[in-house]
């Protein structure tokens, strides 16, 4: 994926997070609760929970909200049991899409996701139809400022175990293997770096270059999917037109 497309995706996600902060906190809270249910509430012993908490902090989620989600997952507070489901399909212009869902009602979420695809120029596919086009990676984004030396940071993250380091318009984008994400993130935290975002994501092996019109159509489908309370993340292999602002 080109640097422009990576940074566009991050900007778009961050802009929506700022505009819909309460909804974003709810979605991250669900991830935290599921991480606790599957691996326990001890941060030291649960790397998935540590990753979720880091993601929450990068989104400026208050600690009391984070702690409440942990308690729900541990059964100390009343909560809901969520199931994780990955839907696969194609958007406009043949863009491959993965839709990550946490739901307490599979029928509702399946209906909502199918409706979004059908009404916005896409097609919901069978399991496995596009997953092979993506790899699970860690992605850490750090905002540029005068106190950060690019070469020094690049050497640090590569020493920490990162796979790739990219310098974009306003940020540095660090990519890791899934199994190295926690180690790299925690090493950067110890160096007092602050993150625009820090999360596991699905990175496409190849991208589909879009016209301005198709960029708008694909983004509309992404927006509709992300408006669903059950949808946690939407991954795709679109490379948006450089004139597209989202």
UniProtKB/Swiss-Prot annotation:
Xref: Gene3D superfamilies: 1.10.10.200, 3.30.70.980
Subcellular location: Cytoplasm
One matching Pfam family: TACO1_YebC_N
Record bears the keyword DNA-binding: yes
InterPro entries noted in UniProt: Integrase-like_N, TACO1_YebC-like_2nd/3rd_dom, TACO1_YebC_N, Transcrip_reg_TACO1-like, Transcrip_reg_TACO1-like_dom3, YebC-like
Range of residues in the leader sequence: none
SUPFAM superfamilies registered for this protein in UniProt: YebC-like
A single GO BP: regulation of DNA-templated transcription
GO molecular function: DNA binding
Superkingdom of the source species: Bacteria
Main location: cytoplasm
Family the UniProt entry places it in: Belongs to the TACO1 family.
HAMAP family reported in the protein's UniProt record: Transcrip_reg_TACO1
Protein name in UniProt: Probable transcriptional regulatory protein CA_C2295
Species the sequence originates in: Clostridium acetobutylicum (strain ATCC 824 / DSM 792 / JCM 1419 / IAM 19013 / LMG 5710 / NBRC 13948 / NRRL B-527 / VKM B-1787 / 2291 / W)
């Amino acid at each position: 994926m080109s640097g422009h497309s990576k940074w566009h995706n991050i900007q778009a996600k961050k802009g929506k997070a700022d505009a819909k902060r309460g909804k974003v906190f709810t979605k991250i809270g669900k991830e935290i609760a599921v991480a606790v249910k599957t691996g326990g509430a001890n941060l030291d012993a649960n790397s998935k929970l540590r990753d979720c908490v880091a993601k929450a902090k990068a989104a400026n989620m208050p600690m009391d909200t984070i702690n409440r989600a942990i308690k729900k997952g541990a059964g100390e507070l009343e909560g809901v049991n969520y199931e994780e489901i990955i839907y696969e399909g194609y958007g406009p212009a043949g863009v491959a899409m993965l839709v990550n869902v946490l739901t307490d009602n599979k029928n509702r979420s399946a209906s909502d996701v199918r409706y979004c695809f059908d009404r916005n120029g896409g097609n919901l596919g069978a399991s496995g139809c596009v997953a092979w086009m993506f790899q699970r990676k860690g992605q850490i984004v750090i905002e540029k400022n005068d106190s950060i030396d690019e070469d020094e940071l690049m050497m640090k993250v590569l020493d920490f175990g990162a796979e790739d380091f990219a310098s974009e318009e306003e940020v540095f984008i660090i990519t890791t293997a899934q199994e190295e994400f926690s180690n790299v993130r925690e090493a950067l935290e110890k160096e007092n770096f602050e993150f625009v975002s820090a999360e596991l994501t699905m990175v496409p092996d190849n991208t589909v270059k879009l016209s301005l019109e198709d960029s708008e159509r694909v983004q509309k489908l992404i927006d509709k999917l992300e408006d669903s309370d059950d949808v946690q993340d939407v991954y795709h292999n679109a490379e948006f037109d450089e004139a597209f602002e989202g």
